[in-house]
Amino acid sequence: MKRAFSSQLRSAYPASKSTHFGRVMASSGSEAKANYAPISTNEPVVSVDWLHSNLGDADIKVLDASWYMAHEQRNPIQEYQVAHIPGALFFDLNGIADRKTNLRHMLPSEEAFAAGCSALGIENNDGVVVYDGMGLFSAARVWWMFRVFGHDKVWVLDGGLPKWRASGYDVESSVSNDAILKASAATEAIEKIYQGQTISPITFQTKFRPHLVLALDQVKENIEDKTYQHIDARSKARFDGIAPEPWKGLPSGHIPGSKCVPFPLMFDSSQTLLPAEELKKQFEQEDISLDSPIAASCGTGVTACILALGLYRLGKTNVAIYDGSWTEWATAPNLPIVGSSS
């Protein structure tokens, strides 16, 4: 995977002039003035208009975190090379991941995440804006990852690359040498950490928040203890066990006691996050209490983070994600499955 990633990056189009993250200036008559506006960490998303106005700020790092299901037959790295927001770097969801499991894109260790972010040139003082090519999909996973490791200055670009382009904003069709090297180095840094090597310099320090992550044993205990409400972001058909999972050999169905809240309920037709009142109605309709603890899962830990994003807008900032999600649960021996199609 590492070699393929590096080689694909190096086959990019000829490098364009790199974007400098300086203070953005907006023209007003014959004078120019700063157009920077601070972002609130109370909100999980920023608009494309906000990002466009502040794209040149040195303290803002923009990440393309596109990832697609296998059946979509889309290559996020190649798509990044063809068109991305100016100055954005590529965050490889499969590359910046745990190497000690066969499960897909699981949360890496603190040391590995710090090494990967440092290789990308991210520092703790930076505000991070994450987007993807779907609109509101895998970017939410990376938003959650940064928060797990103690970085609150992170936001998802509402509507993602599709809304950016629909708004008439420019994209780059080539990457600078610096961007290629950083993207490749991030994956290589992760590999080295898991091989026991030391990486330096480390510019990004982590502070792990265990309450935002659930392990299999905790999910198993919750079936009896009912400490939190467990919501599942997959489709109702997969949840009920009447439609197949996208992964070959994996039965559908759900974890006992969990409730289905399909992730598309969180956004509108343009894949922008719904207003708070509409989000609240969606959870109320599924009999989810906002006054009690909530944890979320999905197929592989990606779309569960979209539910966490919506709940964050409602003030639920401590929603835990079951990282292994359905893939881990359904393949583990002797665990109960409700409505299995197997």
Curated annotation (Swiss-Prot):
Protein's name according to its UniProt entry: Thiosulfate/3-mercaptopyruvate sulfurtransferase 2
Q: What are the cysteine partners in each disulfide bond?
A: none
* Gene deletion effect: No visible phenotype under normal growth conditions.
- Gene Ontology molecular functions: 3-mercaptopyruvate sulfurtransferase activity; thiosulfate-cyanide sulfurtransferase activity
Q: What class of enzyme is it?
A: transferase
Which positions fall inside the Rhodanese domain? 56-173, 224-338
Q: Which SUPFAM superfamilies match?
A: Rhodanese/Cell cycle control phosphatase
Keyword Cytoplasm appears in the UniProt entry: yes
Q: Which InterPro entries match?
A: Rhodanese-like_dom, Rhodanese-like_dom_sf, Thiosulphate_STrfase_CS, TST/MPST-like
Q: What does this protein do?
A: Catalyzes the transfer of a sulfur ion from a donor to cyanide or to other thiol compounds. Substrate preference is 3-mercaptopyruvate > thiosulfate. Involved in embryo and seed development.
- Please give the chief subcellular localization of this protein: cytoplasm
A GO BP entry: embryo development ending in seed dormancy
The organism's superkingdom is given as Eukaryota
Record's subcellular location:
Cytoplasm
Signal peptide span per the entry? none
Give an example GO cellular component term for this record: cytoplasm
Query: CDD domains attached here?
Result: TST_Repeat_1, TST_Repeat_2
State the organism of origin.
Answer: Arabidopsis thaliana (Mouse-ear cress)
